[in-house]
Amino acid sequence: MAPARLYAIIDVEFCESRGLDVLDFAREVCAARPACIQLRAKHNTPSDTLELLRSLIALARPHEIQLYANDRPDLALLAGADGVHVGQNDLPVSLVRKSAPNLRVGVSTHNESQLSEALELRPDYVAIGPIYSTLTKQDAEPSIGIDGLVLAAQLARAARIPLVAIGGIDHSRARQVAAHADLIAVISALLPPSGRLQDVRAHVEEFIANLDPS
């Protein structure tokens, strides 16, 4: 398996809770060149989310970073994003494919049953988690641990669909998780211990380097 790559989730609520401007934070994250970024704006209006997506495209494209919208294929299309990420209670992958055939589609799963069902739908990637307990998401499912991740990796590899690991992954855990996933998705781990915007790029670059087991 090739070294895992970083899937950076730009969460509006997280940024606001830390006193960070979303676009300033995203600019520093993009400068570190993760493989993907996703905009997570659960409580924004559709118009605000669309505006943010368009701004993020301008930040991501120069670095050849894929941009995903969370939950909303309609906004992803309007903004010109690369794809959309849907959860268990969002539009099913099949409907997203019909309405937006050119969008890449990723889907969240939380256990073996959900993962198996998702793999049958042939999304562009499946996310599994939380791997560890997390405080970023208030209604998080039970953590599956490394054993659960190993099983998920076997199923995803057999289906030849990339696997994204998410949930409670920090610098100390990243390399162990990276041994079993194609991409590592994080929110709070993007922010350095200093909490300072000027330290974000170097911090994220270090995180990405830490994913390589060599």
Regions found by a protein language model. Give the residues of each.
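Generic structural marker for isolated residues within well-ordered, non-membrane alpha-helices
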Residues: V93
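Histidine/lysine/aspartate-rich catalytic loop segments that bind and position anionic ligands
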Residues: S113-P142
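Terminal recognition/anchoring or ligand-binding modules at protein termini
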Residues: L183
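CoA-thioester-processing core
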Residues: L135-T136, A140-A156
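Conserved N-terminal beta1-alpha1 strand-loop-helix module at the mouth
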Residues: M1-H85, D90, K98-D124, L151-L163, ...
